[in-house]
A protein has these predicted regions:
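Multi-pass membrane glycosyltransferase architecture that uses lipid-linked
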Residues: 1-248, 270-423
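Generic multipass alpha-helical transmembrane bundles of integral membrane proteins
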Residues: 250-266
């Protein structure tokens, strides 16, 4: 594809996201970013309860069950703090400017990811496949809503995953993987296949150590320099491992039935225990993937990465919409380079994720919260007559997403001969 056309597509994708950047946002997550950037610059504890930011906050959906706290390593607090510092330096007292600045790392990360997908594919298969990939990512309603509207930053972490998979040196691969974990902890599920491609190779052992030690070292350095207290960090971050609730998965059925009171009083304890099943499941299937696929090849590596992503999505007690980005990014490369027959599966998965996102967020009304303070009342008035029907759609979409994940996993484990290790 000509360079001018690539640039034009990237600029268009950027402009579409920027059009939503300053006046939309999720009333829980994006409001947290607003409070977080303010707290970092005013001596607050980013891992404690974040109070509203004076003159900047726009929502307060928080409760005893959903407190205004974060569960990320220091990368994101630092970045939101930098955006607030930039806002303060500009000196224009306009909260929408702050919202615009907070969205910039997210949007730039998402557009950069589109280019990285194109670059990876085109370097291995010149032709139309790279063009399809960049079109898919830049203009998918799902990616646009998550970055430009919602304000979720997972695309930044996925950029590091793609860079890690692209690295020739195992140590460099470990460095990129470590930065991905530092950006958001989800990429830790990919560290083993990204770095441990040959257990007999000493560089692979070094790479996995680097990938795990780097985010810990960077986090420790930030806490020392910023003098942030560490009393709440471990419990806050660890609490997300088995966190449950409404989920873009078949777990929605369990949560729905429990909400109706049809399960015994011990069900929440069982649900909490089952919420941790994804960890041993991931360990087992990571071992299976490394044994089954030739992870020293590009194709085998991405098959293994897809297995890790799918196991995470299938067994995690709470799957939020942004988690699907990890699967979709890997699947785009898989479909474009090696398995075009899976394009229908990728398309269906994306459509189901979009449906779930729309239904789960009250038909997108809540994203207007920065400009419409009465959005909660409007949501209630519009949704109340159809609440049962919406809940059913919610459960169906979540279950359908898991069914598609299982189908993709079975397809993967069938494997093409070129991606499998010799017996």
């Amino acid at each position: 594809m000509p360079v001018r056309r690539i640039v034009a597509l990237l600029v268009l994708g950027l402009m579409i996201r920027e059009a939503f950047s300053f006046w939309t946002g999720h009333p829980f997550d994006f409001e947290l970013w607003v409070r977080l950037g303010y707290a970092v610059n005013h001596g607050g504890d980013p891992y404690g309860i974040l109070p509203p930011a004076p003159g900047l906050s726009f929502a307060n959906l928080f409760s005893s069950d959903s407190t205004p706290t974060i569960a990320y390593l220091p990368f994101w607090p630092l970045l939101t703090g930098l955006m607030y510092a930039t806002y303060s330096m500009i000196g224009l007292n306009d909260r929408f400017l702050y919202y615009f600045l907070l969205k910039q790392p997210v949007i730039i990360g998402d557009v950069t990811l589109a280019y990285l997908l194109y670059s990876y594919i085109s370097s291995r298969k010149p032709g139309a496949s790279g063009a399809w990939a960049i079109f898919f990512w830049l203009f998918s309603p799902f990616t646009i809503m998550l970055s430009g509207v919602w304000g979720m930053f997972d695309s930044i972490a996925i950029c590091f995953i793609i860079l890690s998979a692209s690295a020739v040196s195992r140590v460099k691969s470990g460095l990129w993987a470590g930065l991905g974990v530092f950006a958001k902890s989800v990429p830790i599920i990919f560290v083993t296949p990204l770095t441990l491609r040959n257990i007999r190779n000493g560089k692979s052992i070094v790479a996995i150590v680097v990938a795990l030690a780097l985010p810990l070292s960077l986090s420790a350095a930030v806490f020392l320099v910023m003098r942030w207290p560490v009393t709440l960090v471990n419990s806050t971050i660890a609490s997300t491992a088995g966190k449950g609730g409404w989920s873009m998965s078949i777990w929605d059925v369990f949560f729905y039935v429990n909400s109706l009171g049809w399960l015994p009083s011990s069900a929440p304890l069982l649900y909490g225990a089952l919420g941790l099943v994804w960890i041993p499941a991931l360990l087992v299937f990571t071992w299976v993937a490394i044994r089954r696929f030739r992870t020293d090849t590009d194709e085998g590596l991405f098959q293994a990465l897809l297995v890790c992503a799918l196991i995470f999505l299938i067994f995690k007690a709470r799957v939020t919409e942004q988690y699907a980005l990890y699967l979709l990014a890997l699947a785009v490369i898989d479909v474009a380079l090696w398995n075009p027959q899976r394009k229908t599966l990728l398309t269906l998965t994306t459509i189901v994720a979009i449906i779930y996102l729309v239904v789960n967020n009250y038909f997108l009304i809540r994203f207007l919260s920065p400009i419409y303070p009465g959005y909660v009342n409007f949501e209630n008035a519009m949704i109340a007559p159809f609440s049962n029907l919406i809940t059913i759609f919610h459960v169906i979409a979540g279950t359908a997403f898991t069914v598609l994940n299982v189908k993709y996993l079975l397809n993967l484990l069938g494997g093409r001969r070129s991606s499998l290790r010799p017996v």
